[in-house]
Amino acid sequence: MRLLPLLVPLALTVPGCVPAGSQTPPPNVVAQAEVRDERELIVLTKPPADTLIQEAEALGYELRAVHPLDELGDMLVVFRIPEGRTIAEAIEETERAVPGVTAGAHHLYRIQSTLPADHDYATALIGWPEGGCKALRRVGLIDAGVAPGHPALSDGRVAQERFVPGEAPPSTSHGTLMAELLVGPGKLRDTTVYSAVVVDPVANGGDAAGVTSILRSINWMRGEGVELVNISLAGPRNKLMNRALGQASEDGMILVAAAGNLGPTAPPQYPAAFPFSLAVTAVDREGAVYRRAVQGDHIDVAAPGVDILISSEGRLRVSSGTSVAAPFVTAVLAADPSLSAEDVGTVRDKLLQRTVDLGQPGPDETYGAGLISAPPDC
């Protein structure tokens, strides 16, 4: 491993060098997928949704909800699956009955950090200035809630919208940590973070987000003019996510996603493994990859993500995970004019000039293009 100059802050392993961000077909091995409800079917269709609803109800499906996704050009429709049919059967039946729709399961996407995991080395490792950097792009955060009035967020503003069902107070621990890494003291300044609360504080252990919440949050952010989105959640491949997030990417939104913490031999996690996302892995102070990080040819870039010091609820705590690494990349992209672009392919190419190579020479499946570095002048 190359020595890192102090100036500078998840997939199956295949030998050899692979261009950062290159994609292979989905592997035969897939991650074990969690679903919110085995009797729930999610469908995306171009508006109006009348034909879809009529055909589905004729087949015995019960309409649960309709959510317009105007900014993405779709309608999100939720059905209850009839007794005796599996999700796979329901997907195939619905897509056959109404050509052009995309049907899928209500998969869950979990937070990718561990608490607790010694010093605040991260900003020095990537060369981030002590006074922080001015944000040049509007930033979004898809995560748990951000605690209002948190003292560590006095340098940044947060506009928050809730996309989870029910009225239980949102979980704010992880979302606040991510917001601090983006707009806390010495981070991005002169900006507002658009925080989408998608992690359900009640269902499925309280650390998971459903597909519908994520898609509705992306639609909201498009309407707010958000250009750069941080997603520290990971889960299975989902056709609905592919369609909606892919459309947002085509419209110029850059998605920065945690690679996942299932380990180096685990299958790719999504949305990081989608070709339109920037997949972020985590490294420690020595530049060694986080031992639980997912690896693969979809990994784009590395950032500090092991034993990261963060203030939380009036005390300091240490956190590790690809979830923690992603905001460092998001912050650099927001502040560095040389990385400003409307398509992820251009950003991916430019990262080769804004990273420090790690591991074997050139881009690889462990570190991607290498360790992200802060803009020289911000």
What are these regions (language model features)?
Residues 128-139, 144-159, 166-211, 274-275, ...:
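Subtilisin-like serine protease catalytic core
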Residues 70-73, 89-156, 366:
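Protease zymogen maturation seam
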